[in-house]
């Protein structure tokens, strides 16, 4: 959990992308459109950074940028100020914004098998920009599940609260869904770009196979972003192979002429954070522990908890109540009392009770109030805790007719906030990819057995390496393993 701007600001910004331009001539229209597209992309890029954060690895960022810029230079729009980013997210995903802004997650980079695969994915996103799909596509909002519950998991009550009313009740990125034809067009364009700069064009097909394996490993609620928002993988694998064949024939190439870059990618992936980063908070039983901010909070038993970059969200099993922990958006020098008064005033809240609260030995404020959202009234318990120079805001929400059933539980959870003193939790680090040399010829399963400290399942290791557990690894070859992370019960 970190302090970031609200979701509403990002929604407003992305809605702005859909506004039509008015121009007088074809050339002026194109120039204005390009300038407007670039400026919109730049503004959105700031919001993306605030919402998700860029992965802090200069070498990896430069590596991804170098791959992207070489292909962009061969595209139909080489003069755009292309920008390539690695997002600090474990979800396997990639997307592009108008103006030449392309994003891949560290999760996607970790699962790529070689540089040609990564180039295929980046080329695909370049294809969305060069194809101007964002200008012509049918706009449809959906939540990208980057560390938060997808909107479809919320009840109607919670969705109402997410979409209107209380500021910062949930965060997420509103993306626009491309048509099937646009996705396939981007695939074909990306394969062409990758081939034109010397990559093996079959790379993206290999990555589609990895996505297919992840889809088979996951239940449907956990399908990676690049699977859940794109056409059927089987169809894309078949088409990508055909387009790769055509690209090879067009340039009169053989596979020996083209670059795969397995060792090159593995050198960059070695040490990359894998999965959720516990430094930004993790669950141990019902307790949420945050090592960097040094606090803990007990959420109600059996509630579904998701940790995002700007908030921690918990929803009751019946989806009738909602808890959210976040940092209050205080103005510089604003006292806690002044912030709470301003917050309630800006909400037009009807306050029924307020005052000091007992949260251990920490100074805290509490208010019970109601707000209007989506033509309905909601009851809210707000708790504000002044700790270590920050003001923490905990909101407990339910409908008025369910308030008695949940208010005591939500108050107990809010008042469990305390300093984190567990040294083991304070020192926990993230799991990381480790490129490991194999000492003798053996099956992948045997390699894993040699390292009992591997912190992910054997099936995940197999997918990371594009292998089966029975595949033989030659002596001296390397594989991706994962070590570290919190020791969860």
Q: PLM features: what roles do these ranges have?
A:
Residues 1-13:
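Bacterial N-terminal signal peptides that target proteins for export
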Residues 8-11, 18-290, 296-299, 309-311, ...:
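A Zn2+-metalloprotease active-site environment signal
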Residues 103, 391-395:
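Short hydrophobic beta-strand segments that form the core of ligand-binding sensory/regulatory domains
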Residues 119, 305, 394-432:
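Surface-exposed amphipathic alpha-helical segments
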Residues 296, 302-304, 472, 478:
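Residue-level marker of beta-strand positions
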Residues 425-455:
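Primarily a LysM-type cell-wall glycan-binding module
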């Amino acid at each position: 959990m970190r302090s970031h701007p609200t979701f509403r600001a990002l929604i407003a910004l992305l809605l702005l992308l859909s506004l039509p331009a008015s121009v007088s001539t074809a050339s002026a229209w194109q120039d204005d459109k390009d300038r407007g597209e670039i400026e919109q992309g730049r503004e959105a890029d700031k919001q993306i950074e605030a919402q998700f954060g860029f992965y802090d690895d200069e070498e990896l960022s430069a590596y991804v940028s170098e791959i992207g810029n070489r292909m962009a230079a061969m595209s139909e729009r080489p003069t755009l100020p292309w920008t390539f980013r690695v997002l600090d997210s474990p979800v396997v995903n990639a997307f592009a914004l108008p103006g030449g802004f392309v994003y891949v997650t560290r999760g996607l980079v970790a699962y790529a098998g070689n540089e040609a695969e990564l180039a295929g994915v980046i080329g695909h996103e370049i294809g969305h920009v060069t194809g101007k799909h964002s200008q012509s596509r049918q706009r449809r909002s959906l939540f990208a599940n980057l560390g938060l519950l997808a909107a479809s998991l919320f009840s109607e009550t919670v969705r109402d609260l997410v979409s209107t009313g209380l500021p910062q009740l949930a965060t997420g990125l509103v993306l626009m869904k491309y048509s099937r034809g646009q996705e396939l067009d981007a695939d074909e364009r990306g394969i062409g770009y990758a081939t034109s700069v010397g990559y093996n064009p079959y790379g993206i097909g290999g990555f589609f196979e990895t996505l297919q394996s992840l889809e088979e490993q996951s239940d449907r609620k956990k399908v990676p972003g690049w699977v859940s928002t794109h056409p059927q993988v089987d169809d894309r694998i078949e088409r990508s192979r055909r387009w790769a064949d055509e690209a090879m024939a067009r340039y009169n190439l053989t596979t020996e002429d083209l670059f795969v870059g397995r060792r090159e990618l593995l050198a960059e992936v070695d040490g990359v954070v894998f999965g959720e980063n516990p430094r930004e908070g993790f669950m141990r039983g019902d307790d949420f522990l945050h090592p960097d901010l040094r606090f803990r909070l007990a959420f109600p038993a059996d509630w579904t908890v998701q940790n995002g970059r700007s908030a921690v969200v918990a929803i009751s099993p019946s989806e009738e109540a909602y808890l959210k922990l976040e940092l209050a958006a205080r103005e510089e020098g604003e006292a806690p009392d002044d912030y709470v008064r301003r917050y309630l005033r800006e909400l037009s809240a009807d306050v029924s009770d307020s005052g000091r609260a007992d949260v251990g030995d920490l100074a805290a404020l509490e208010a019970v109030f109601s707000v209007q959202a989506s033509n309905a009234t909601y009851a809210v318990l707000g708790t504000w805790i002044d700790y270590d120079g920050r003001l923490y805001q905990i909101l407990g929400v339910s409908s008025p007719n369910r308030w008695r059933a949940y208010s005591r539980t939500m108050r107990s959870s809010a008042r469990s906030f305390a300093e984190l003193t567990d040294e083991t939790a304070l020192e926990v680090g993230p799991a990381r990819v480790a490129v490991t040399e194999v000492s003798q010829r053996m099956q992948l399963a045997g390699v894993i057995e040699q390292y009992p400290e591997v912190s992910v399942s054997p099936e995940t290791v197999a997918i990371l390496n594009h292998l089966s557990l029975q595949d033989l690894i030659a002596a001296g070859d390397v594989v991706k393993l994962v070590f570290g992370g919190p020791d969860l019960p």
